[in-house]
Curated annotation (Swiss-Prot):
NCBIfam families: rplB_bact
Protein name listed in UniProt: Large ribosomal subunit protein uL2
GO cellular component: large ribosomal subunit
Domain of life assignment: Bacteria
Keywords: Ribonucleoprotein, Ribosomal protein, RNA-binding, rRNA-binding
Subunit structure, as described in the record: Part of the 50S ribosomal subunit. Forms a bridge to the 30S subunit in the 70S ribosome.
Disordered: annotated segments: 213-280
Described purpose of this protein according to its UniProt entry: One of the primary rRNA binding proteins. Required for association of the 30S and 50S subunits to form the 70S ribosome, for tRNA binding and peptide bond formation. It has been suggested to have peptidyltransferase activity; this is somewhat controversial. Makes several contacts with the 16S rRNA in the 70S ribosome.
Gene Ontology biological process: cytoplasmic translation
Signal sequence extent: none
Residue stretches of biased makeup (Basic residues): 268-280
Transmembrane keyword on record: no
Length: 280
């Protein structure tokens, strides 16, 4: 993937950039692997906003991604196409299996049309192959990692992300997360070899607010420009700083958003690198 920069023909185009989509081999997705999506605008069943800054955006169809890959062990698959997915930052690869099945997976770095991938304990260590952590050598970069055996990939799924397998001890494997956190995961959990592709996506300059609206993201308003009834930082005569430490609209201090008593915290060996305001 490469990034194409626009000429500054308008204020919105100045500095803006877009992917050149050279890796994409097909623009029409596989119809059998698509489902309709109904937008909720960040509202719950009662119509109240539960997630701010969401709403609108271009209509999308959801692509069914195989995050488990446990029912095609031992069956080789050919990469038929690399496709764009509007629901995620990574590209996706359409696999044609020898038994006739078709599946979508996340497209790792280096995977191209015509390559052959496989899954299972005896799969080779090459990008796109999926196998249990116990069968992957230490030092390998992996992505789409399960947190529980058979639970489907949960970790390292966005464009350019990867996890390093540091080693294995007894029934657990030690993983270095993209954040720097070191976490233990059951060796029966599966992972895909390689890094997630489309890494240059992080360098795209969206250029104007309208492009973010196309993505379904609404404006984020600062608390200090609101009224006191709307935010703890609101009000005051003239331009103010809020007059207190940063808090959420509901008065909770900024940072420390992780659940403190999460059951899986006991498997964290070393916390992620954090700033002072996020330190525990």
């Amino acid at each position: 993937m490469a990034i194409r920069k626009y000429k500054p023909t308008t204020s919105g185009r100045r500095g803006a950039s877009v992917s050149d989509f050279t890796d994409i081999t097909r623009t029409k997705p596989e119809k059998a692997l698509m489902r309709s999506l109904h937008g909720h605008g960040g509202r719950n069943v009662h119509g109240r906003i539960t997630t701010r800054h969401k709403g609108g955006g271009h209509k999308r169809a959801y692509r069914l991604i195989d995050f488990r890959r446990n029912d095609t062990d031992g069956v080789n698959a050919k990469v038929a196409h690399i496709e764009y997915d509007p629901n995620r930052t990574a590209n996706i690869a359409l696999l044609h299996f020898l038994d006739g099945k078709k599946r979508y997976i996340l497209a790792p770095q280096g995977l191209s049309q015509g390559d052959v991938v496989e899954s299972g304990a005896n799969a080779d260590i090459k990008p796109g192959n999926n196998l249990p952590l116990r069968n992957i050598p230490a030092g390998t970069l992996i992505h789409a990692v399960e947190l529980r055996p058979g639970g489907g990939a949960k970790l390292a799924r966005s464009a350019g992300s990867s996890i390093q397998l540091l080693g294995k001890e007894s029934s657990y494997a030690s993983l270095r997360m993209p954040s720097g956190e070191i976490r233990r995961v059951d060796v029966r959990c599966r992972a895909t070899v390689g890094e997630v592709g489309n890494a240059e996506q992080a360098n795209i300059n969206w250029g104007k607010a309208g492009r973010m609206r196309w993505k379904g993201k609404r404006p984020s308003v600062r608390g200090v420009v609101m009224n006191p009834v709307d935010h703890p930082h609101g009000g005051g005569e003239g331009k103010t700083s809020g007059g207190r430490h940063p808090v959420s609209p509901w008065g909770k201090p900024e940072g420390r958003t992780r659940k403190p008593n999460k059951s899986s915290n006991k498997l964290i060996v070393r916390r992620r690198r954090t700033g002072k305001k996020h330190a525990r």
